[in-house]
Each structure stands twice: as structure tokens, then as C-alpha cells.
Amino acid sequence: MAKVIGIDLGTTNSCVAIMDGAQPRVIENSEGARTTPSIVGFTDSERLVGQPAKRQAVTNPSNTVFAVKRLIGRRVGDAEVEKDKKLVPYSIVNGGNGDAWVEVRGEKYSPSQISAFILQKMKETAEAYLGETVTQAVITVPAYFNDAQRQATKDAGKIAGLEVLRIINEPTAAALAYGLDKKDTKTIAVYDLGGGTFDITILEIDDGLFEVKSTNGDTFLGGEDFDMRIVNYLADEFKKEHGVDLTLDKMALQRLKEAAEKAKIELSSSQQTEINQPFISMDRNTGQPLHMVMKLTRAKLESLVGDLIKKSLKPCEAALKDAGVSKSDIDEVVLVGGMTRMPRVVEEVTKFFGKEPHKGVNPDEVVALGAAIQAGVLQGDVKDVVLLDVTPLSLGIETLGGVFTRLIDRNTTIPTKKSQVFSTAEDNQNAVTIRVFQGEREMAADNKLLGQFNLEDIPPAPRGMPQIEVTFDIDANGIVSVSAKDKGTGKSQNITIQASGGLSDEDIEKMVRDAEANAEADKKRRELVETKNQGESLLHSTRKSIEEHGDKVDPSTVEAIELAMGALEEALKSEDAGKIKGGIQNLTEAAMRLGEAIYKASQAEGGATPDEEGPRSVDDDIVDADFEDLGENKRK
């Protein structure tokens, strides 16, 4: 039975894990790292994912996409998208359906597509380790992701060639990994501050039962924001000193971003770090190069980002209130996400909850490990684990006057189903439009519109008379289906909610085909590179053999080999793998004649020597030796 893999699709880094016997384990990627940068780079000739993409980001900033998770399921015009446009060097554009997409080298990509490229890398990592094809996965999302963002993540899995068996919340996955072997009853808080999102989840764990009591968060708060605070500080200081605005130069901005991330990491273990960026700009008056050499202290960093850390504590208050527990009721605080390595974050969390956080989990890997456990549960490999998650935001419809009428409150355990009867607002109304929203505001317009549909052919009747039953159904992935039924006629209409724009089935199928075509193209490119390497290696070894042994063979053999070498050199200039293979075959055959000639020549040389020295008897090779028989006594 093929393995189901667990994937933590992160804003900054991603990670893949599997169940290895009774325990989950993280799989190293082709570079030997346990996490992979969630970065996709586009060059003239290829698409790079992970570390190779990160390495070329400074020289190719406009065509390198990072932190795309912050755009997934979002619309152009959203405040978060407008903010992101100012922070990233690549283009964020309208996808044509109102969704925020990215444009690279004149081609538009949906965030789901970019995420799919990262998921493909995770899939390939698992396949290389397992030695078999992987088709199913559990993928994690921030607990505070709305329906559109969850649906877009599921679409990304489909584009990557994966059947997504479950979308699981990141803090819940972390709790699974933390509590898998724990038998006692505990109430825990999972504080998850990652690269782009923040979640706080309160859970009760009781001998294999994981029950989420509440969740809260901010899907636009994370390490990327901390990095940008440092970038802005460095750019401001440089402008004060040299009068040059580095934020206008995409390449300089990318260098600053990498320097900021490195400095932030270093300041988690040291009090001061130096940021050294030579030749980062040029003096417009003198034409002389300008260098950035600055010191950054931990205290300065903490002053730059203090409000961001404080911002994470408000959702913690809300989550405790919704769960009906106090800070003193929390038995353990589990820290998740790379940003929780920052000492000031740990201090603030300790102060807030009144206890030292648990440090027994790797914050970068624990979510992927939890996803692997959930995969094991679904596959039947992990027994006695029951997971009860919740929907993070209230769901409802718009009613008369633009009011948001809730059908399912936030923190309701999922899967769940809820129905409510509504009626018409006008006499003889023959159709109703059901507009579905998600959020906590009282007016529908202030919440997130998930989608809408019409129920038509309602028989004419006075207002308030028709009975229209609206049913919300949320599955275990947190994805919403809505139906409306006229109880008088039995006529019904239903939809699985997609983002207001969203990807249609046709869009997804096209992207799946593109991904498959790209996979085939990548395979051909790899085959071409390997064939070229083989050809160059053969040329080198043959050339060396001619230099050393060319005088031992007749000139016609050498000439034939040199002709074959010339033909292969020409073939190597092309991009035709078949032509190169033909050249390799011809040179291999010609080089074999060289080997045969060398072997015959050495045999001839070796065979002439004994005749010149004259015949020898068999005894010539025997050496006489005297020995003394010790006898029995002498042997003892």
C-alpha cells in the first residue's frame, strides 16, 4: 500500500514527513536539508524550486517568488495584498477573476500554481526516499485560514498531482506530534508564529483524543514582517548616510532582505551582529561604489519588532475566552514556527501565560510530523487517535438590510451540519440569491464573501410565506458546502463554496496538464544534462588515451577516433540528446579500436622478451633451499 505523506506547506519553508513504523520522521531533500525554502525562481531556461531558487534570488529578484502563501485565496484590492505589493520585488496582478496572482516573465501564475511547484518538490523528495510513487497527502494550513484559502490549498495539491486526503490546521498537527505518546489529560496552548502567519489554538488532550477548544490568529503576521522591519531600518539608515534609497533598487532590496533574515537568526543566539553588504549601490555624484557596514544589536531588533510580538497576544486572549479557560488552566504551552526561536518572543509568551513554554519539539518540523501522524490515522497505521478540530470563523448568509446572519459559530467542532429556515423579503418574489459570508462582523459587507448562488422558480406568494431552508455543511477539511431548498416545491440548489473568483475545475485541469508537461520537460532537461556530462567525460578520457598511447597504434585508427571526437564535440553544442547519444556511441566504438590496438601492442612487446633471452627449462623458476629436519623432539 502506497504511503500517504504529510506536508507542512509553509510561507518561508516547507517540510515533508512520513510514518516510519510507529513514529513520524522528516525526509531530507536532495540538498540534504530537512526543510525546503518555499521559493520558486524562473530563469531563461528552467524553473527552480527551494534552495537553488533562493541562491539566485539576489540576481533575479523580479522572477523569484517567495511567501506566496500570503496571497493564496486572496483578492486584488484586499488590504493585505496591497501591503504585499509594496514589499515584494515580483509583480502581483489581477488573475482575471479578481484573485491576486503573480506575473513572472510575462506569464501569470495563481498562488495555487506556485504552491503546487513547492508541493511537487515535496512529493519528489518523498518519492526519492521511498522508492515509489506518492499520490496522496495530508497538507497543513494555518488554523485561521478561511474557506477560500483552504480550497486554494487543496487546489494546489491537485495541480501537483496529489490527492489531498485531509487539510489539517498547523497548530493541531503540532499538538498531534507533541501528544502522540502522552496518556495523561492536559490542556495545552499551541502558539504558532511562522514565516507569514500566526495561530493560537487551545486543545484538550486525553489519551489519544485531541479536542480543539478554540482557535484564533492573524494570517498576515509572521517572520516576513519582522524581516521587513529590519530591511526598512537598514534602508533608512543608509539613506541618512548616503542619500540613496535602496528600496527603489530591486536587487539591493533582495540583498537587504537576505541580510535581514540572516541578522534576525544570528541575534537569537548573540547580542550583536554585523551586516556587511559591499557594493550595494553607487554614489550618483562621484560614481564611487557604496558599501553597507552596520551593526545591529538584539536590543535594537526588539525595539523594531516589539509591537508585532504584542500583536500576537490579542488573539491569545480571544482564544482563551472562546475556550472558556483561564491562563492558569493551561498545563503546557507548545511553541511552533521558526519565529518562536527569538528570545523576546519566548519572554513575552512566558510572561503572558505565566509559565515557561515546552521546548521538547522542533518548531520547524513538528507541523510536518503531525501531518504525517494524521496521514497514518487515515491510512490505518496509527490507532487510537481521534482528532476533533473546529472551524476558525463564523459562517452565515446575508439577510434583509445587509445583516450577517450566522448559521455556524466560530470554534464549532467539525465536521458539522446546520440548517435554518428563511423566507422572502418581498411579495411574489420568485427567486432568492444566497450570499455566503465568513467572519465575525455584524454586517455582511464587512466579512469575507465566499460565494453566492440563486434559488429560482419560487411560486408567487406574500412576503414571509415561502419556506426556504438553508443548510451549511463543513467537512473535516473545513471546506464549506451550502444548499438551499424551497420546502413548498422541494426544489433545491447547492454549491461547494469556491473563492469569489477561485479556480474553476477547467483552470485546475489545465494547470495539472501544465504541471505534467513541465515534469516531462524537466525530465528531458535532466536527461540532456546527464547525456552531455557523459559525452564530455568520454571526450576527456579518450583524449588522454590518445596522448599517452597514440604512438602505439596506426595513424588511420587515430584519425578515425579524432573524427568521432570532432563529431561528438559538435553534437555537444546542440540541445539534441539523441544526436549526442549517437556521437557517444560512435566515439565509444572508435575508442574500443584504440584499446584493442594498445592491448595488442603491449602483448607483442611482452611476448618478444622471452625469445630474445633464449629458452628456459621449467626448473629455471625453481629456487633450491636447504632445510633441517627438526624431528619430533625439536618441534616441541
From Swiss-Prot:
UniProt keyword list: ATP-binding, Chaperone, Nucleotide-binding, Phosphoprotein, Stress response
Q: Do you know which Gene3D superfamilies this protein is assigned to?
A: 1.20.1270.10, 3.30.420.40, Actin, Chain A, domain 4, Substrate Binding Domain Of DNAk, Chain A, domain 1
Please list the residue ranges that the record marks as compositionally biased, kind Acidic residues: 620-630
Q: What induces it?
A: By stress conditions e.g. heat shock.
Q: Where is this region: Disordered?
A: 602-636
Query: What GO molecular function annotations does the UniProt record carry, in alphabetical order?
Result: ATP binding; ATP-dependent protein folding chaperone; unfolded protein binding
Residues annotated with Phosphothreonine modification: T197
Q: Which Pfam families match?
A: HSP70 (PF00012)
* Similarity comment text for this entry: Belongs to the heat shock protein 70 family.
**Which HAMAP family does the annotation name?**
DnaK (MF_00332)
Described by its record, this protein's role is as follows: Acts as a chaperone.
Annotated protein name in UniProt: Chaperone protein DnaK
- Which organism does this sequence originate in? Cereibacter sphaeroides (strain ATCC 17029 / ATH 2.4.9) (Rhodobacter sphaeroides)
Q: What is the lineage of its organism?
A: Bacteria, Pseudomonadati, Pseudomonadota, Alphaproteobacteria, Rhodobacterales
